[in-house]
C-alpha cells in the first residue's frame, strides 16, 4: 500500500507565555482558530504490514527496509500503527464505555470511549533516552448495520519531559476496499496532530492508496541481496557492484516533471546525461544521453520566505543496459548558483554533503518544473551511503 503524508507546520501561539503542557493544551482547546501556517512538506512511501509490524520502502524500490521509521521521516514527525495496532489495543485491552447513539444521514452510529492505562499500552513514543510506553485514551464510532468501525481517535497522555512534545492526537478514518473479490476494512485517511512545549503544532494528513494483498507464495524482500562474487580474472572497470570514482564532473537533466500539487519526497525521478562522463584519462565512462535514475528526498514549501525547497539524489547511471551505482552533488558543492532555465531558482550548498542529496530553491507560488538542468560532481559513495535515506 502507498501512503502520502502532507505535514503542515504551525507557528507557536504569540500570546502563549505559560510553557507548561497543561496550560498549552487548555489554551489550544479554547482556541477557535488555527495557528499561523509556516510551511509544509510532502512524503510518499510504500508500506507493508507483516507479522513483525509495519515495514517501509521508497516508492518503486525493489524491497522493503527494516530500518527505523525515522530514517524515512526526515525532519518532521511520522507515525505508524494505523493498520491495527491502535485498534487492536483499544478493543482488546481498553476500558470501554458506551457514550451515545447518533443518527447521521438517517443511519444509527454507536460512539464509545476507551482508556488504555500504561500497564496495558503498546503505544511507544521516541524520547532522547529511547522508546517509552505511553498511556492513551480516545473514542471509536461503530456502524452497527455494516458491523464496521468508522472512526478511531487516539490521544496520548502528557508525553515525557525529555521530549519536545506535550501530546499527540490521531484520528483514523476507516473504509472498505476490494482486494481479490473481498471488501477489506482499512484506514484510508489518518490525521496526526503533535502539540509541542513551545505551543507550536504539526499536522500530518496521510492518505492510503493502491492497497493489495501479497499471495501466500510471495517473497517479501526486507534486505538487499549479497553481491555476486567477481568472476576469476575479471578486469571490468565498472560493474553493478562498483560505483563511479569521485571527482567526475558532468551535466545532467532531470526529465521527470516536478509539480507542487503532487510531487513528494520519495518519488523516483529519471534523467539523462547532457555531457559524457569521463575519467581522469579522458576515457568516456558513460556517454551523453545515458539514462539517470534518482529520487526526490525533500519536497517542502516555506510560506513566509516564499520558496520551495527540493532535494534530489542521483542513484545510478545506466550504461549498456547495466545500472552503475552513482553518488553525486551539484557543482560547485559549496557555492550558490543559478538554475538553468526561466524559473527563478538557486542551487544551494547541501545541508549535509555526506547525504548525497543536492538542494534546490525556487521562489514561485506554484512549482511546475518540466525539466531541471544542473552540473554535478561524483562523490565517494561510502560517504553518501552513511546517510542513505535522510
PLM region spans:
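Structured extracytoplasmic
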Residues: 1-137, 144-150, 155-185, 189-246, ...
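Long, contiguous hydrophobic alpha-helical segments, chiefly transmembrane helices and signal peptides
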Residues: 136-142, 188-190, 206, 269-271, ...
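Contiguous beta-sheet cores, especially beta-hairpins with glycine/small-residue-rich turns
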Residues: 150-152, 175, 239-390
